[in-house]
Amino acid sequence: MSLSRRSSLRLLAAAAGTAALAPLVACQPGGRRAGRTGPWRLGVLQYLQVPAVEVTREGVLQGLAQNGFRPGQNLQVLLRQADGSPARCRRLAQELVAADIDLLVAIGTPALLAAIGAAPGSLPIVFCYCANPWGAGAGGSATEHRANVTGTVTTTAVGELLRVAQLLVPNLQQVGLLYNPAEPNSSFEAELLAQAVAQRQLQLVREVVTDLADLPEAFQLLQRQGVQALIKVEDYVTLEGFDQLAALALQARLPLLAEEPDDAGVLGCLAMVGWRSIQDGQRAGELASQVLRGTAPASLPMQPPGDPGLWLNRDTARRLGIPLPASLLTQAQAVLG
């Protein structure tokens, strides 16, 4: 785990210091539910259907299969899709809990929030694709969390993104951010970014987007304020509208840095720092396997799926006229284009 990653986790813990924790009761959840025979029953609650989330879910199933839990053999998967609706997500969480499942996998912070709200303390929950589990009520730190909850934490490595941005734009002074403050992930990461920007004596310019239709106007507002680079954090609006955002950035010759591996291959995205979605899901699948075999979630720290990697887009760099520094080329996990 990098220094910036550890710093993010400390900030997360502090931000959720007032959250109520479920007690670590004597009856720790884990393993098969009482009296159950036949295939294990796995509930999967997915907040949004976009490629990165779909790949994460596939990774979960791969992680389970690699540890002996295979759909169609000894594992029954009950998948529910919330289509980006918090109300629907809550209803589906209740539906899965009523289906007498052995374990609930929550994909996305809103899905985790709904799962925690619906599940009794005896039902294990494993989460992934989640930037802010503390804000969803999972616990106060990586090791002090609800007895029935564990999972993977993918808080954007904002410090590393800024370091990369400063190498790509040497005279960087102003950084732009488009975000939806109504989203817990987005508002939380916006504050992390603001702190990281201040530490580097830079300026952060924010504009709000609550819908895809807001993107062009909000982008133009950032442009008019003279931002020299745009940072994308966890946000469902910019996630869904990333192709549009990348096209706007390319047209404006504005460097765009993101946190989703799928973003890195989009023309207009210059760099990405983050985790592969398949890697995130696989690690969550491994955690789910441990829980199904009887390990108490309380004993499994909430954890990142590994160290974040760097992806660079050479085609975007050429179009922007930005040379890729040798130090970044050496560090990069992938150079596309």
Where are these regions (language model features)?
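Short hydrophobic alpha-helices and adjacent helix-cap/hinge residues
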Residues: 2-337
